[in-house]
């Protein structure tokens, strides 16, 4: 599963904290949204369950939910990525892990398993991208936040869509997925600027019709596939 560009066109990121508006059963909320998003055509799912409104403080429930999400993704042949939690990712045999600049070094992650784990790395500055470009352990960059976002506590400075173009013009060749406040109207420009895909949270979790919104996002991204 190393043709990374193929899994990035529509990268869905979510946890229970993103679906709490749907009802009291946090796990059922996320599974409902994930199934609709899979039906709509997401190409990758990142389990990012963190914060005071998540299951982060009940690890057993969080692990059980992660396994259910993983199994659902496998029914649809969609890669299942875990955010930050390397131990969880390895324990449940996730397809990949996504880490930030201050998380476990990617060399350590790669050394923990012989399996072909997908590793994504968050990037907010050009110098970070230049460092990551030379790290063979990294499969793709998550670039953001592109726009202001409410989905992450204490987000880093926003970059704007043109930052994707800046990275490509600077010689960055690794696959890129743009994240942070991305909506349907932004997909065309982000793809034209050189993103291999878009990562969304609210554009799916808060859609009136999750499956239809997902389908529209996927079609917009595929239209500009390389």
UniProtKB/Swiss-Prot annotation:
Cofactor or coenzyme needed: Mg(2+)
Residues reported in the UniProt entry to bind 4-amino-2-methyl-5-(diphosphooxymethyl)pyrimidine: 46-50, 83, 122, 152
GO BP terms in the entry: thiamine biosynthetic process; thiamine diphosphate biosynthetic process
Keywords: Magnesium, Metal-binding, Thiamine biosynthesis, Transferase
Family annotation (CDD domains): TMP_TenI
Stretch forming the signal peptide: none
Pathway: Cofactor biosynthesis; thiamine diphosphate biosynthesis; thiamine phosphate from 4-amino-2-methyl-5-diphosphomethylpyrimidine and 4-methyl-5-(2-phosphoethyl)-thiazole: step 1/1
Reaction catalysis annotation: 2-[(2R,5Z)-2-carboxy-4-methylthiazol-5(2H)-ylidene]ethyl phosphate + 4-amino-2-methyl-5-(diphosphooxymethyl)pyrimidine + 2 H(+) = thiamine phosphate + CO2 + diphosphate; 2-(2-carboxy-4-methylthiazol-5-yl)ethyl phosphate + 4-amino-2-methyl-5-(diphosphooxymethyl)pyrimidine + 2 H(+) = thiamine phosphate + CO2 + diphosphate; 4-methyl-5-(2-phosphooxyethyl)-thiazole + 4-amino-2-methyl-5-(diphosphooxymethyl)pyrimidine + H(+) = thiamine phosphate + diphosphate
NCBIfam families noted in UniProt: thiE
Sequence similarity: Belongs to the thiamine-phosphate synthase family.
The protein's name in its UniProt record: Thiamine-phosphate synthase
Recorded name of the encoding gene: thiE
């Amino acid at each position: 599963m190393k043709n990374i560009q193929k899994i990035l066109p529509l990268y869905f990121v979510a946890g229970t904290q993103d679906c709490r508006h749907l009802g009291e059963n946090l796990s059922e909320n996320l599974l409902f949204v994930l199934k609709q998003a899979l039906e709509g055509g997401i190409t990758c799912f990142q389990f990012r369950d963190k914060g005071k409104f998540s299951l982060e403080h009940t690890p057993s429930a969080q692990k059980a939910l992660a396994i259910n999400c993983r199994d659902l993704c496998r029914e649809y042949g969609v890669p299942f990525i875990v955010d930050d939690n390397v131990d969880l990712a390895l324990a449940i045999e996730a397809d990949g892990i996504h880490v930030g600049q201050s998380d476990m070094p990617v060399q350590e992650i790669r050394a923990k398993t012989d399996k072909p784990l997908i590793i994504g790395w968050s990037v907010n500055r050009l110098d970070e991208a230049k460092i990551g470009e030379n790290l063979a352990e990294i499969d793709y960059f998550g670039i953001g936040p592109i726009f202001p976002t409410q989905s992450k506590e204490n987000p880093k400075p926003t970059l704007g869509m043109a930052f994707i173009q800046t990275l490509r013009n600077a010689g960055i060749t690794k696959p890129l997925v743009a994240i942070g406040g991305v909506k349907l109207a932004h997909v065309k420009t982000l793809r034209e600027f050189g993103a291999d895909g878009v990562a969304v949270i609210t554009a799916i979790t808060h859609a009136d019709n999750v499956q239809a919104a997902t389908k529209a996002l996927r079609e917009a991204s595929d239209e500009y596939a390389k």
